[in-house]
Amino acid sequence: MSFSVDELARIAIDLQSDIGHTDRFSRLITTLRQILGCDASALLRYEAHQFVPLAIDGLAQDVLGRRFALEGHPRLEAIARAGDVVRFPADSDLPDPYDGLIPGHESLKVHACVGLPLFAGQTLIGALTLDGMDADRFDSFSDEELRLIAALVAGALNNALLIARLEAQNVLPVQPVNDAQPERQEIIGLSAPMLQLKKEIDIVAASDLNVLISGETGTGKELVAKAVHQGSPRAANPLVYLNCAALPESVAESELFGHVKGAFTGAISNRSGKFEMADNGTLFLDEIGELSLALQAKLLRVLQYGDIQRVGDDRSLRVDVRVLAATNRDLRQEVVEGRFRADLYHRLSVFPLSVPALRERENDVVLLAGYFCEQCRLRMGLARVILAEAARNRLQQWSWPGNVRELEHAIHRAVVLARATQAGDEVVLEPQHFQFAVAAPMLPTETAAAAPAIEKVNLREATDSFQREAISRALEANQRNWAATARALELDVANLHRLAKRLGLKGSPPGKNSAG
């Protein structure tokens, strides 16, 4: 055998190390790369017809954020279907998923590739991939030796998956790995703040507590809400979404609680509200800080007593609904200033979740960039979307005031720009494809010079200043047409008028022309 006793011992020790799964697998992959002499190695978890990287060595860091759907990666599909060691010949016409993703070899194609499917019983749970730039890199290792490696790694991976499920569900016994489960919403990130958030999601999801999710715009609060619902006993029942910021005051109560025929002009039939739709499930109220005080009082009653009244109906209806609420405001400050009910705040914030801003998430920007690159590749029918090292550095230097949403849009825009100037079905993203400054977020123009410096104001004042400037610019761009401005800002026009009035941008109701 090509493996020495000492080398096998190193592998066994790495698999049994008393450290976290992520660190254990990273060390294992590094050891395997050294023993096998390959240029790149990766451990992948299999779920929902795709491979998810758990640990890599010798590959670009953004690979950890990519999700390799079988339908778009024929080599990985071949590994998943093989049931045994797969050796791809150097002249294979199947594209390697890591072409262009090995630092220092971006312009070269991977030559030698070995795939080891990992099984728990008869169920595929992952794969180990080994890549080399030389065509004969793995010829000295027999299939028997590689099967031994696969068996050791598969056992460790299966144990890690079972332990993770135990920790998430906090129940015994667990269901077998191959049982059908509702698809969990994946939250990408390995930074300390995100690992803590994932742990808190697992804790609160198993309960039936109402949850308040706070965070800046674009951080992924809706994704967190989906993860809480999908990890809860209500996962098989509906998750109903309502954006409170997009609710005109005139229909907000009907949207929440429903109405009966004839309750108001235009009510031509009975209609269920969001609470009825979410019965036995979960209701996600996004931007809950935008609700009026009157509606807050009615929402509080539902949380207290579990009954609702349709508009125009004297009868009460019982509902069993878990409420998840999200806000980008500091609701404690809103309570102090009289814009949010203290009793409702306390009802919602028994177990609050805070979603960190992207600038606080260390290297997660690279993982997320890889994820969005792979999404773009699939959507645009490209063979590869590669993030050049200089581009990765540029992304890490930006402070991302728009958070994950801004990063997603930046990647999509960069792919479109790069594709327009590069031939073929492979796109390489370079720094020039990202159109923003490097050192800091773009500063406001001279017209906004009077905006208060963030260091000298609290969060509320800074947010108001930003909103005031954004609305002012949108109004100018739309010739002060309020309806067009509302569309540009993706707001309901009535909500835009209320917000503008609160910010001191208007003092009277809109005239006839402003609606138009």
Swiss-Prot record:
ATP binds at residues 215-222, 278-287. Keywords: ATP-binding, DNA-binding, Nucleotide-binding, Phosphoprotein, Transcription, Transcription regulation. The keyword Glycosyltransferase does not apply. It holds the Pfam family GAF. Residues 482-501 bind DNA. Transmembrane segments: none annotated. GO terms for molecular function: ATP binding; ATP hydrolysis activity; DNA binding; DNA-binding transcription factor activity. The modification 4-aspartylphosphate is found at D57. It comes from the Bacteria. The keyword Hydrolase does not apply. SUPFAM superfamilies: GAF domain-like, Homeodomain-like, P-loop containing nucleoside triphosphate hydrolases. CDD domains: AAA. Pathway: Nitrogen metabolism; nitric oxide reduction. Required for the expression of anaerobic nitric oxide (NO) reductase, acts as a transcriptional activator for at least the norVW operon. Activation also requires sigma-54. HAMAP family: NorR (MF_01314). This is Anaerobic nitric oxide reductase transcription regulator NorR. The gene is norR.
